[in-house]
Amino acid sequence: MIAAHGAARLPEVEVDSYNVEVKDNEGFIGDRASKGAFRDIVENLRKSMRKNGDDPFGDTASEDLTKKQFDDALAKGDHEAAGVVQGAVEDYSQELALIIKRYLKLKAWKDTERVVIGGGFRGSRVGEIAIGRTSVILKADGTDIELVPIRNEPDEAGLIGAAHLAPKWLFRGFDAILGIDIGGTNIRAGVIDLNLKKAPDLSKACVWKHELWRHAEEKKVDREDAVDWLVETLKKLIAAADKEKLKLAPFIGIGCPGMIEPDGSIERGAQNLPGNWESSKFNLPLLLHKAIPKIGDEDTAIVMHNDAVVQGLSEAPFMTDVHSWGS
């Protein structure tokens, strides 16, 4: 049996909670652990420096600074630029530690032994240092929990995790599946090589080919544009896999922001996507199934879950030594 959309019980794990909406007087606390939150801290430090002298990053807007620029500044850059990045890492780590402690007070999180840190900020040395510093802060405060960076590149983990939405029997005789990772800035679709002969637990699964659409950079994009792009891209990926004799399982796994209902609709949390994805009249899995009813000779099965859950699922093969973990 294949899980329903947004299911709590999946083939390898049970999802106690996701899309946690913990608020304080500044809003949702989870927003303060994002890549954007780190840049906000950098900008505040730069503002202080501009009042009293030169900005070591010049005229470049904080939102335009790349992860490589942060890494270079910390490793070999101007001493004041390094100081800004180091200060931002410290402030961010303190904030992340507070957020994790707040989450651990929740019933669903209280027995968590390990937390996997993903997201776009993870894919840099500065991000790894921030994770390490947060771990030190928590342990020094007596919080017994392990923090680890996500193994795969975050952009790929969101696709690889899609393979864990379906039972492994569905993949017998097949080489790969289709995965979709939907975000407020980008949408990705790709072919995930399952590599089951190398690792039946999917620990060797990898992205064989993928396409990216930076929809946030375009004007007047709506949800119909997103569906059209996905359908066209999935058909291209199916053709590419067929050309290379890579046998696709009749399955599409989707990671999407928000609270996912069993019928594939989105209750809330999709406000950053183009158009109104929370409408009761919009159902992405049904639309994709209508456009791609079969993959090869088999009927297409589609499962959609929250994007953070799907990214976290890419770590499932490496979590067998703990009972409860989060991401």
How does the language model describe each region?
Residues 89-101, 159, 227-238, 310:
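Short, hydrophobic/amphipathic alpha-helical packing segments
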Residues 116-117, 179-181, 254:
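Short beta-strand segments enriched in small/hydrophobic residues
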Residues 100-114, 230-252, 292-296:
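Phosphate/pyrophosphate-binding loops at sites that engage ATP/ADP/AMP, CoA/4′-phosphopantetheine
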Residues 5-83, 182-232, 236, 240, ...:
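Short glycine-rich, Thr/Ser-proximal phosphate-binding strand/loop in the N-terminal lobe
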Residues 2-37, 64-115, 119-138, 147-158:
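Helical "lid/coupling" subdomains associated with nucleotide-phosphate turnover
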Residues 1-32, 160-197, 262-327:
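Phosphate-binding/catalytic loop of phosphoryl-transfer enzymes
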